Protein backbone atom coordinates (compact mmCIF):
# COMPACT_ATOMS: atom_id res chain seq x y z
CA UNK A 1 0.00 0.00 0.00
CA UNK A 2 2.85 2.39 0.84
CA UNK A 3 4.51 1.72 -2.51
CA UNK A 4 1.24 2.46 -4.31
CA UNK A 5 0.76 5.69 -2.39
CA UNK A 6 4.38 6.74 -2.99
CA UNK A 7 4.06 5.97 -6.70
CA UNK A 8 0.82 7.94 -6.92
CA UNK A 9 2.37 10.95 -5.18
CA UNK A 10 5.43 10.84 -7.45
CA UNK A 11 3.23 10.63 -10.56
CA UNK A 12 1.05 13.53 -9.45
CA UNK A 13 4.10 15.61 -8.58
CA UNK A 14 5.74 14.83 -11.92
CA UNK A 15 2.54 15.74 -13.77
CA UNK A 16 2.22 19.03 -11.93
CA UNK A 17 5.87 19.91 -12.49
CA UNK A 18 5.77 19.07 -16.17
CA UNK A 19 2.56 21.06 -16.59
CA UNK A 20 4.30 24.09 -15.12
CA UNK A 21 7.41 23.52 -17.19
CA UNK A 22 5.52 23.82 -20.47
CA UNK A 23 4.00 27.19 -19.68
CA UNK A 24 4.60 29.59 -22.55
CA UNK A 25 7.60 31.83 -21.95
CA UNK A 26 6.06 35.18 -21.15
CA UNK A 27 8.28 36.84 -18.57
CA UNK A 28 7.92 40.23 -20.22
CA UNK A 29 4.42 39.75 -21.62
CA UNK A 30 1.49 41.73 -20.28
CA UNK A 31 -2.21 41.04 -20.26
CA UNK A 32 -4.66 43.57 -21.79
CA UNK A 33 -4.84 45.55 -18.51
CA UNK A 34 -1.05 46.04 -18.54
CA UNK A 35 -0.38 43.59 -15.70
CA UNK A 36 2.59 41.23 -15.93
CA UNK A 37 1.59 37.72 -16.91
CA UNK A 38 2.21 35.24 -14.11
CA UNK A 39 4.13 32.24 -15.43
CA UNK A 40 3.70 30.12 -12.31
CA UNK A 41 1.03 30.73 -9.67
CA UNK A 42 2.00 28.66 -6.63
CA UNK A 43 -0.69 30.34 -4.55
CA UNK A 44 -3.37 28.14 -6.16
CA UNK A 45 -1.65 24.79 -5.62
CA UNK A 46 -1.84 22.31 -2.76
CA UNK A 47 0.84 22.30 -0.05
CA UNK A 48 2.54 19.16 -1.32
CA UNK A 49 2.73 20.39 -4.91
CA UNK A 50 3.95 23.85 -3.86
CA UNK A 51 6.66 22.39 -1.64
CA UNK A 52 7.78 20.08 -4.46
CA UNK A 53 7.73 22.86 -7.05
CA UNK A 54 9.77 25.24 -4.89
CA UNK A 55 12.28 22.46 -4.22
CA UNK A 56 12.47 21.84 -7.97
CA UNK A 57 13.01 25.56 -8.65
CA UNK A 58 15.81 25.73 -6.07
CA UNK A 59 17.43 22.53 -7.36
CA UNK A 60 17.14 23.41 -11.08
CA UNK A 61 16.42 27.15 -11.42
CA UNK A 62 17.42 27.56 -15.08
CA UNK A 63 13.94 26.97 -16.62
CA UNK A 64 12.41 29.47 -14.18
CA UNK A 65 14.89 32.35 -14.32
CA UNK A 66 13.24 35.51 -15.63
CA UNK A 67 9.75 34.09 -15.10
CA UNK A 68 7.05 35.78 -13.02
CA UNK A 69 6.21 33.68 -9.95
CA UNK A 70 3.39 34.20 -7.45
CA UNK A 71 3.50 32.46 -4.09
CA UNK A 72 1.57 32.51 -0.85
CA UNK A 73 3.21 31.76 2.46
CA UNK A 74 4.22 33.51 5.60
CA UNK A 75 6.67 36.35 6.07
CA UNK A 76 10.05 36.02 7.71
CA UNK A 77 13.33 37.89 7.54
CA UNK A 78 16.99 37.49 8.38
CA UNK A 79 18.96 40.50 9.62
CA UNK A 80 22.58 39.91 8.59
CA UNK A 81 24.20 42.48 10.86
CA UNK A 82 27.69 41.49 9.77
CA UNK A 83 26.98 42.70 6.22
CA UNK A 84 24.24 45.21 7.06
CA UNK A 85 21.63 43.45 4.92
CA UNK A 86 18.09 42.36 5.76
CA UNK A 87 16.77 39.47 3.68
CA UNK A 88 12.99 39.04 3.33
CA UNK A 89 11.39 35.70 2.46
CA UNK A 90 8.10 34.03 1.71
CA UNK A 91 8.15 30.76 3.65
CA UNK A 92 6.07 27.80 2.45
CA UNK A 93 5.48 24.75 4.65
CA UNK A 94 4.76 21.35 3.17
CA UNK A 95 1.34 19.75 3.59
CA UNK A 96 2.18 18.38 7.05
CA UNK A 97 3.97 21.58 8.14
CA UNK A 98 7.02 19.58 9.19
CA UNK A 99 9.34 21.03 6.55
CA UNK A 100 9.57 24.43 4.90
CA UNK A 101 10.95 25.95 1.73
CA UNK A 102 11.27 29.64 1.14
CA UNK A 103 12.24 32.13 -1.49
CA UNK A 104 13.77 35.49 -0.77
CA UNK A 105 12.11 38.52 -2.32
CA UNK A 106 13.08 42.14 -2.98
CA UNK A 107 10.19 44.58 -3.21
CA UNK A 108 10.02 46.97 -6.15
CA UNK A 109 10.67 50.61 -5.31
CA UNK A 110 11.99 52.13 -2.11
CA UNK A 111 10.97 50.48 1.15
CA UNK A 112 12.09 50.88 4.73
CA UNK A 113 12.54 47.97 7.09
CA UNK A 114 10.78 47.28 9.41
CA UNK A 115 8.13 49.97 8.72
CA UNK A 116 7.07 48.70 5.28
CA UNK A 117 7.02 45.00 6.18
CA UNK A 118 4.54 42.84 8.13
CA UNK A 119 5.07 41.01 11.38
CA UNK A 120 6.92 37.69 11.29
CA UNK A 121 4.47 34.92 10.46
CA UNK A 122 1.97 37.15 8.64
CA UNK A 123 0.30 35.47 5.66
CA UNK A 124 1.58 37.13 2.50
CA UNK A 125 1.16 36.88 -1.26
CA UNK A 126 4.30 37.76 -3.24
CA UNK A 127 4.67 38.16 -7.00
CA UNK A 128 8.03 38.81 -8.64
CA UNK A 129 10.54 37.80 -11.30
CA UNK A 130 12.87 34.94 -10.34
CA UNK A 131 16.53 35.90 -10.65
CA UNK A 132 19.78 34.59 -9.26
CA UNK A 133 22.62 36.50 -7.64
CA UNK A 134 26.02 35.70 -6.20
CA UNK A 135 27.11 36.62 -2.72
CA UNK A 136 30.38 35.47 -1.13
CA UNK A 137 30.84 32.92 -3.91
CA UNK A 138 27.41 31.32 -3.43
CA UNK A 139 24.53 31.53 -5.93
CA UNK A 140 21.14 32.45 -4.44
CA UNK A 141 17.66 32.91 -5.91
CA UNK A 142 15.20 35.69 -5.18
CA UNK A 143 12.07 37.29 -6.59
CA UNK A 144 12.92 40.81 -7.75
CA UNK A 145 10.67 43.77 -8.55
CA UNK A 146 8.28 41.99 -6.20
CA UNK A 147 4.89 43.09 -4.99
CA UNK A 148 3.68 41.88 -1.61
CA UNK A 149 0.22 41.93 -0.14
CA UNK A 150 -0.55 40.95 3.42
CA UNK A 151 -3.50 38.59 3.61
CA UNK A 152 -6.13 39.59 6.13
CA UNK A 153 -6.43 37.25 9.10
CA UNK A 154 -9.88 35.81 9.78
CA UNK A 155 -11.04 36.68 13.28
Name each region found by the language model.
Residues 4-15:
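Sec-dependent N-terminal signal peptides
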Residues 6-7, 19-155:
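OB-fold and OB-like single-stranded nucleic-acid-recognition modules
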Amino acid sequence: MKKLLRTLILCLTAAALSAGAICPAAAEAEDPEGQAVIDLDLSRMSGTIVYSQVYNMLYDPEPWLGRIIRMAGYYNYYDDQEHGTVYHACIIPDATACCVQGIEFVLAGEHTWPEDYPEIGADILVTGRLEEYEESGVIYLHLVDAEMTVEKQEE
